[in-house]
């Protein structure tokens, strides 16, 4: 069953949101941004491109999506969200397709939907507590940071694969002036 999360009420210190509130907000924002980028890439790729391995030492976009589902599922959904851990990490990399891209997107979306609920419900005590995950002993804070960093890292790899395969600009920052300086 689903555990109840502690300390979820909004807390303010000197009129500002408490650090756990800021962490939850920023972690969710960055994961959602990565999710949209991955969805955009997967939608653009054909089924063969989705499972294309550039060489023996690189995995496909499809493998990376499965790997992210496994990582988020294990570290957030199972460890912090109290779901059973059925991860088979090697299978994430051994899959060669042709898993339908719709199924792949749905798996990612379902994994992240639960993770968003879990992260959104974390309180100060959850972030400070030490948890055991994948053979490591980590605080809740370290788990959230790991998942966001890991998700972003592989989102970049998925973007690179897509750009290499399709020779496109992904348009992530279309309409934004990225040459603005701090004012």
PLM features per residue range, with description:
Residues 25-26, 87-103:
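Short acidic-aromatic linear motifs embedded in glycine-rich loops, typified by GG[WY][YF]DAGD(H)
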Residues 28-32, 36-39, 49-92, 133-183:
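Short, contiguous alpha-helical
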Residues 44-51, 118-128, 163-168:
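Surface-exposed helix-capping loop/turn segments at secondary-structure junctions
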């Amino acid at each position: 069953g689903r555990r109840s999360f502690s300390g979820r009420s909004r807390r303010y210190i000197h009129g500002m949101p408490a650090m756990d509130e800021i962490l939850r907000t920023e972690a969710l924002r960055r994961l959602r941004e990565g999710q949209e980028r991955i969805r955009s890439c997967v939608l653009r790729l054909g089924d063969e491109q989705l499972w294309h391995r550039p060489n023996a030492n690189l995995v496909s976009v499809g493998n990376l999506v499965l790997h992210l589902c496994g990582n988020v599922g294990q570290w957030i959904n199972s460890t912090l969200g109290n779901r059973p851990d059925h991860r088979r990490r090697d299978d994430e990399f051994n899959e060669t397709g042709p898993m339908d891209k719709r199924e792949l997107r749905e798996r990612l979306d379902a994994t992240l939907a639960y993770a968003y609920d879990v992260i959104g419900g974390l309180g100060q005590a959850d972030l400070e507590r030490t948890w055991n995950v994948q053979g490591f002993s980590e605080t809740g804070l370290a788990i959230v940071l790991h998942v966001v960093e890991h998700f972003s890292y592989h989102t970049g790899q998925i973007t690179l694969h897509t750009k290499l395969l399709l020779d496109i600009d992904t348009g992530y920052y279309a309409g934004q002036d990225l040459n603005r300086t701090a004012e």
